[in-house]
C-alpha cells in the first residue's frame, strides 16, 4: 500500500511516488501535501473548494482568483492553478 503522507511537488511524477496518491498544492505552486484520493467526487470537491485550483479559465473567473487556468505539466494531475493574465495586474 502506498504511503500518501508528507510534502510533495505537483511536478513530481507520479505524485507522492505512487499513482495511488494525490498531491494537493498548498499556497505555493511548488509545494503541496500528499493525500489518498477517495474517489473522483472528492477531487472535484477539492477543486471546487480551493480558491486557486481549476480545470478551466471559466472556473477561475467564477472563483474570482484570475482569468487563466495554468495546467500542471504532469499528466497525473487533472487540474491547474488560477492566475490573472491581465497585464495591468503585473
From Swiss-Prot:
InterPro entries attached to this UniProt entry: Albumin_I, Albumin_I_a
Post-translational modification note: The C-terminal glycine may be removed from A1b.
Pfam families the UniProt entry points to: Albumin_I, Albumin_I_a
Chain segments annotated as transmembrane: none
Disulfide-bond pairs as recorded: 4-21, 8-23, 16-34
Origin: domain of life: Eukaryota
GO molecular function: nutrient reservoir activity; toxin activity
Signal peptide annotation: 1
Keywords, sorted A to Z: Disulfide bond, Knottin, Seed storage protein, Signal, Storage protein, Toxin
Residue ranges the record assigns to the propeptide: 40-47
Free-text note regarding domains: The presence of a 'disulfide through disulfide knot' structurally defines this protein as a knottin.
Cited function: A1b binds to basic 7S globulin (BG) and stimulates its phosphorylation activity.
Protein name (Swiss-Prot/TrEMBL): Albumin-1
Protein's organism: Phaseolus angularis
Gene that specifies this protein: LEG
Amino acid at each position: 500500500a502506498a504511503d500518501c503522507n508528507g510534502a510533495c511537488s505537483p511536478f513530481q511524477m507520479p505524485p507522492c511516488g505512487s499513482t495511488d496518491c494525490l498531491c494537493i498544492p498548498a499556497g505555493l505552486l511548488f509545494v503541496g501535501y500528499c493525500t489518498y484520493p477517495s474517489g473522483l467526487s472528492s477531487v472535484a470537491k477539492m477543486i471546487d473548494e480551493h480558491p486557486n485550483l481549476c480545470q478551466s479559465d471559466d472556473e477561475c473567473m467564477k472563483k474570482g482568483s484570475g482569468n487563466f487556468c495554468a495546467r500542471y505539466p504532469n499528466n497525473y494531475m487533472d487540474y491547474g492553478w488560477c492566475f490573472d493574465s491581465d497585464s495591468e495586474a503585473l
